[in-house]
Amino acid sequence: SSAFVSCTFERAALHGASFEGCRLTGSTFTECRTRPLTLRDCDLTLVSLAGANLAGVDLSGLRLREANLVRADLTGCDLRGADLSGARAERLMLIDADLRGSRIDAALWMGAVLSGARVDIDQAVLFAAAHGLSIGGDDADGGEG
């Protein structure tokens, strides 16, 4: 395993790179070529991937806690089991992404573009709650109308 802690990758050509069992904690990726990219069992806690194009990359099971994902493109990504707790997600593109089993905060549900994303039932309830929806069968008028 390797560690690139608090490193700055600027305009790096990372396409075809493979990171396995790697700690990238606090590192910043700016204008990097990142596809295709292999990331397995990596810790990307506090990493900045703002504006990164990672469409279609397998990010399943990765630790992305408190990552900066603002305006990143994760369209079609496999994020099953990923930890996105506390991630900054304004305008994060998660179109057609698989989010089942991932840990997600209300801020991501509010800030990301999620059309076609696959989620668990529990996640759908959290999404609804983040958007202020009330889920339940209690009607004030008893359902008569």
Locations of the language-model features?
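Tandem repeat scaffolds
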Residues: 1-145
